[in-house]
A protein has these predicted regions:
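Conserved structural motif at the start of ABC-family nucleotide-binding domains
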Residues: 3-5, 18-20
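Conserved ABC ATPase signature
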Residues: 119-123, 127
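The feature captures the beta-strand-to-loop junction immediately N-terminal to the Walker
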Residues: 34-36
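Conserved ABC ATPase "signature" region
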Residues: 97-114
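Catalytic Walker B motif of ABC-type/P-loop ATPase nucleotide-binding domains
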Residues: 144-148
């Protein structure tokens, strides 16, 4: 099912942050959402994901079960190791196949096997971000929502990230909120400018 937004308006008290937005997303590919800080980009992702229902208008094709979200704040479980954070987020059963998928994804995002047993308080911001991204990539959802996915990454890790997004976006929709289009220009994203 395509993700379609019709006449979406979102207010915080008397302040309108999204005003009558209508947009039909493609079934696959990369869409970059840009705009000034505080304009409603992350709020739009929260609405698409089904985490925010306090709006007027219509959103079809989003919601829990249809999207996978890599938050800007990482949202890792503090009592789980890096590998277990990924496994727990994608599956409630820990078996060899799931462990292999999680390890392969973490390695493809530039983490080392020695990082797998580290807990969030032992990880750098970039490592936390890549674990959050691994969780989103491995969830079986037709739409991925990535909020500032390159924020904590160096050029080498941005390159690894864009390689994965390039592959995933062949049959899934990847929506990226970013302030830095330069980091993802190699993906040739469709640009949705919010003002």
């Amino acid at each position: 099912m395509s993700l379609i937004i019709r006449n979406l308006t979102k207010k915080f008290d008397d302040k309108t942050v999204i005003d009558n937005l209508s947009y039909e997303f493609p079934d696959h590919g990369v869409v970059a959402i840009t705009g000034e800080s505080g304009i409603g980009k992350t709020t739009l992702l929260r609405i698409i994901s089904g985490l925010d229902y306090n709006y007027s208008g219509n959103v079809r094709g989003g919601g829990i079960g249809h999207v996978s979200f890599a938050f800007q704040e990482y949202r890792l479980f503090p009592n789980l190791s890096a590998i277990d954070n990924v496994i727990f987020a994608i599956c409630d059963t820990k078996n060899e196949a799931v462990i292999k998928k999680a390890k392969d994804m973490l390695i493809s995002l530039g983490l080392k096997e020695s990082d797998f047993d580290l807990f969030p308080h032992e990880l750098s911001g970039g490592m936390k971000q890549r674990i959050s991204l691994a969780r989103a990539f491995l969830k079986d959802a037709p739409t991925l929502l990535l909020d500032e996915p390159t924020k904590e990454l160096d050029k080498e890790n941005i390159s690894l990230l864009t390689d994965i997004i390039q592959k995933i976006s062949k049959d899934r929709l990847v929506i990226i909120v970013t302030h830095n289009l330069e980091d993802i220009e190699c993906l040739s994203p469709t640009i949705l400018q919010i003002s």
